[in-house]
């Protein structure tokens, strides 16, 4: 077998495994075996760049930067649907159809209406060539690079597919992924996303496709459009699409008459909460494509389809009290304590009130009868008050002025929605929350130590900050509740092992507000050690790539706090990694200091990653796009014509990889 044949074989095999895992939900190999095959393919492609293929499974991780999303015209207009809210509306719709068509037998396709971001994907000769958002229906944004990172979207089709066609669908964010993303945001003191739909839609417009690849997006496809397609009905088209490799929802149902449509609606109105993603109704379509053509379109929607919207999941109950939670960053979150009520298949006792502005906007008061809804079918929220049931002695809610835990006066910065407790080192939930964040998996990853144990250690006076962890002994821990010799030894050993955790993880573990994993990596890479970050001023920090005013101000405030500096000194004395280690800090020279490079194309001597590393190791900076600040473009084979044109317009030096090697050796 030749190298090319090996590469092609691995690509086909990995595409099949992706299909089995992400579309059929039926993996046939382990994650480990998949990763081994993917690594083999990456190695072969790296050593044989002449066989580069943008549609290879190795390109699913993203990495393309899109500064401006080009507007593209849809080959076929993306219409919206008329909505119906009752079965009478559906019967009226059927009567209009029968009046237009005459006395012909009708079959309907029933599909769940997914609440996500609509997308139109074009395939030519079995390959994905472009993906465009709905936009205004006539034109949308080109998000091809981002769509390619979604594993459920096939890059290359299989079977007897047509030469060219569009397929429409919905990009969705399953509940579990949405909850995980929000939990990660809450851990770093950021505001969580409002709902899965908006988060999915916003994800498609992220500039860095590598960031899109990290998000657990899914894609459900439900409509084919094109010329001379090899089927006569909508249902047959869906069956074909499945065979070609598309993820078509298995809930789609062929109904022989309107009574069967009603049965489908009734079933899913009751069972929609069992699904892993948002649905807000059912779409009903005439099945026969010839009849669809005959019915045609109004100015904004197809006559042959209609959406039935489920009633919003709302209940009313009494607001018994409002409590206030303190997060690890000091952020105050008001919580409504409700008379227990069933909503969307679960018993709801509490709902978030978000902040003081939300309470004032809705004029929410204790003992009110409130309307509760599950936002995105997940997070209960109060959406209104039944004023007719408000008690005559009702008092307007006065938002707390002092911390409910430590009684410190709260602060609210200009432009921020939340109030904060400034008692950073004296407020129990802040201290415990900060230590819990420090030990977490993505931070110091301390085994043998969990959140409840942290609270136990604090309440027994053994720790007041994360530096105290390194002074713990087995003898101190043993007397604590639920502690045995082995668990105490494991805890102490886990703490000691954390001394080997890299600097970027340590920086994230410190719990600086707005400094998440990505920002911590940027700061660690730029400044190399904690002292350099501590000494940086506001202006210097905002000059770092992707560091804005809010993050920079938070970093400055953290290092201006003398207690923080004292804790850092103790961490340093305990051997914590507060600088990039020599093996990771591979700066070879400063020959390229101050120079900005853009790398584009396929190369023979270096891989793209090797070029970027060589630039940074010699003091240079890698840019994501060509601008007036770019000094050099290193051009390989198949460099994009748009980049080439822009480089020439801006008179940026275009060099080969051989020229780059000469720069390093000069």
Curated annotation (Swiss-Prot):
GO terms for biological process: DNA repair; DNA replication. DNA ligase that catalyzes the formation of phosphodiester linkages between 5'-phosphoryl and 3'-hydroxyl groups in double-stranded DNA using NAD as a coenzyme and as the energy source for the reaction. It is essential for DNA replication and repair of damaged DNA. The keyword Transcription regulation does not apply. NCBIfam families: dnlj, PRK07956.1. It comes from Flavobacterium psychrophilum (strain ATCC 49511 / DSM 21280 / CIP 103535 / JIP02/86). It holds the Pfam family Nlig-Ia. This is DNA ligase. PROSITE patterns: BRCT (PS50172), DNA_LIGASE_N2 (PS01056). Residues 587-666 form the BRCT domain. CDD domains: BRCT_DNA_ligase_like, LIGANc. Gene3D superfamilies: 5' to 3' exonuclease, C-terminal subdomain, 6.20.10.30, BRCT domain, DNA ligase/mRNA capping enzyme, Helix hairpin bin, Nucleic acid-binding proteins. NAD(+) binds at residues 31-35, 80-81, 111, 134, 170, 285, 309. GO terms for cellular component: cytosol. Its cofactor is Mg(2+); Mn(2+). Keywords: DNA damage, DNA repair, DNA replication, Ligase, Magnesium, Manganese, Metal-binding, NAD, Zinc. It comes from the Bacteria.
